[in-house]
A protein has these predicted regions:
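Long, low-complexity, intrinsically disordered segments
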Residues: 258-279
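Beta-strand-turn-beta hairpins that frame and shape the catalytic cleft
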Residues: 1-4, 104-115, 162, 219-223
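Conserved beta-sheet core of the metallophosphoesterase superfamily
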Residues: 63-67, 83-86, 91, 95, ...
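Active-site-proximal loop/helix segment associated with metal-binding centers of metalloenzymes
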Residues: 95, 109-186
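Core catalytic region of metal-dependent phosphoesterases/phosphodiesterases
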Residues: 6, 12-107, 184, 188-195, ...
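Catalytic cores of nucleotide-sugar-dependent glycosyltransferases that transfer UDP/GDP/TDP-activated
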Residues: 9-13, 129-145, 186, 190, ...
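Short, solvent-exposed loop/turn segments at secondary-structure junctions
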Residues: 10-11, 41-42, 71-73, 118-122, ...
Length: 279
């Protein structure tokens, strides 16, 4: 079994990076996992396009896992069937697509993985989107979800292997700013301050996030992902890996796609009757 981690896919817009044209899936099975660090974007209104791309993911030779970002259809997402999977609560989105809920701890392939989705949309988004339709107050975790997270971490002794979030803790701001000016759009806020309190208490090996549209190590043990895919090392070696040197990181970045991933996949066709193949 293998675990891969990547950044936002924004429905079909950035999904090409996990297509066979950009990501070698040779030998993978449904016991291998691709984790998306938020802004999954394929659960909004149950449209034909969303159904097509969920079927496309089901046809891939891996299981897709994701934490939520700020660009999700929370009304539909939170209405999906819930179940316990690998020790934590999930929404089952498709046969092999699962939403890893907030404040959960999962045991996956020898890793203990804490998940805490959510982030605040930009002021521009809030002004130009429609509340309850294209942006939701649920994008930022509420008090109950944060209490659940604390309870989960208490039970785990404030110790885990990996943390998967959408936005980063506030202390990562300096590292993010070295690579992008997106903090002007998505500044650190009350929720990233709360994530900071988690980071300050938690013993962990590595923290992955999305949101900032960069591929960079933004703190000693924190990596932001967007187009790149990180393949986790075996748990035994990963747990000994701490630091900024590539040889000591608990993951290996897969080779960068030769072309812009968006150009490597045929976009959704409006006539679904012609979509006999999910390749």
């Amino acid at each position: 079994m293998s675990i891969f981690v990547t950044g936002d896919i924004h429905a079909s817009y950035d999904i090409a990076k996990i297509s066979e044209s950009c990501f070698d899936t040779t030998g993978l099975t449904k016991d291998d996992y691709v984790i998306v660090c938020g802004d999954f974007g394929l659960v909004w209104n149950n449209t034909a396009s969303e159904q097509y791309w969920l079927r496309w993911l089901d046809a891939r030779p891996f299981t897709t896992l994701f934490v939520d970002g700020n660009h999700e259809g929370f009304a539909l997402l939170n209405s999906l069937p819930e179940t316990t999977w690998n020790g934590g609560r999930v929404h089952q989105v498709a046969n092999s697509v699962f939403h890893l809920q907030r404040g959960q701890m999962f045991d996956i392939d020898g890793y203990r993985i804490f998940t805490m989705g959510g982030a605040a949309s930009s002021q521009y988004d809030r002004e130009h989107r429609v509340l309850g339709e294209t942006w939701f107050t649920e994008e930022v975790p509420n008090e109950q979800e944060r209490a659940t997270a604390i309870e989960t971490l208490d039970q785990a002794g404030w110790n885990c292997d990996l943390v998967i979030t959408h936005c980063a803790p506030t202390s990562a701001a300096k590292g993010i700013s070295k690579h992008t000016d997106r903090l002007e759009i998505h500044p650190m806020d009350e929720y990233t301050d709360w994530l900071q309190t988690i980071q300050d208490r938690l013993t962990y090996t590595h923290w992955f996030c999305g949101h900032y549209h960069i591929d960079a190590q933004i703190q000693e043990n924190t990596t932001a992902l967007y187009n790149r895919i990180a393949m986790l090392k075996e748990p035994e070696s990963a747990n000994d890996a701490k630091g900024s040197d590539a040889s000591t990181l608990p993951y290996q970045l897969l080779a960068e796609a030769a072309k812009e991933p968006k150009h490597e996949i045929t976009d959704y066709a409006t006539d679904l009757d012609d979509q006999d193949s999910l390749e």
